[in-house]
């Protein structure tokens, strides 16, 4: 799942069916010659209040211990996911570049991990923070990381999925996609699909479609339920199962 257009025809030739499940947002730095992130309200407000962002290529042991404490607080007793996204693991964290946020009292209150895709593209994976932080802190971390990635010479940053965005909007769409379009429009009790799209639009320069592929002899519903079960075995706080199924 989360398959890009370049693989759709290949998988079709291998006997897979596929349905569109949303679009992934991309920030294209080549369109921004000047720094646009420091003008954002969340960036300015927390900076003025004394919050700091520090970027580590090699994480000190004492910092790792604090991040582990933050991660445990964020999980709130729930299990790590066992599929799709990274988990807080020493080996994983030690091989990742990490950005942290310190509050005015110099306490580490949140962190974000960098996820390189290739020499020109990157994304982020873990984004965790303490319970008592300002609402703007996650955005503060993302903006600072994007600023750092731009300085490093990356051209694009993937912002993750807008689940079900632009799915099943035409009369030629597959039945499964048309059903998902109804969920996108009216499924507010399941997940704030349209709100997520609007929030990501702030950073996004391009939207790129993503697909869910399943074997020809299987049904979309059965395959989707299998995927939900696989993800749900390790669900954690902050991301619903329905979001994780269609999230980058």
Task: Locate each region found by the language model.
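A conserved beta-strand-loop-helix scaffold within acyl/acetyltransferase catalytic domains
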Residues: 1-19, 23-176, 186-199, 203-204, ...
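Short beta-alpha connecting loops at secondary-structure transitions
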Residues: 181-185
